Amino acid sequence: MRKYIIMVFGDMEAQYILGLSYYRGEGVEINSEQGVYWFEQAANQGDADAQYYLGVSYANGEGVVKNYKQAVYWYEKAANQGHADAQNNLGVCYEFGKGVVQNYQTAYFWYLLASANGIEKAKDNMDRIAQDLSPSQQIEIQNRATRWFENNNGR
């Protein structure tokens, strides 16, 4: 047991897996608070999956008090590492003004990245708000996304 505890306290992947186990109730009883605790440990070391799940936890109020500003904070950390689901969820926050000032251009940007990273619903989300953007705005955002991919190793 001591070896296991030492491994978990130092290893962000093990921390993330333990958080996910508590969050989903896999091998242990569901305990959202414990899930959030372990996600925080891994997220603070830079684990994008843990950052994403912290965002989900804050957005849904699971294991923590619902707080969209915190959800956006964690989604943004994960999204900037190329986490496609976080990119889509960040787009949702910007589209509907959850935790941020509503901004269709920023929402479109994050949906575009998520779509390029394989999230099918992001394309639908992007199409939905495209009608509120001019063609020149869409082109500008597409160029920004291209630069983002170039600067982030295609993630």
Regions found by a protein language model. Name each.
Residues 8-11, 15, 24-26, 31, ...:
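Short helix-capping/linker turns of helical repeat alpha-solenoids
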Residues 5-6, 50:
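Acidic, proline/serine/threonine- and glycine-rich low-complexity intrinsically disordered segments
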Residues 120-155:
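Terminal, low-structured helical/coil segments at or just beyond the last alpha-helical repeat
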Residues 15-24, 53-60, 64, 89-96, ...:
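Hydrophobic face of amphipathic alpha-helices that form TPR/SEL1-like repeat modules
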Residues 1-4, 42, 78, 114, ...:
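Alpha-helical solenoid scaffolds that mediate protein-protein interactions
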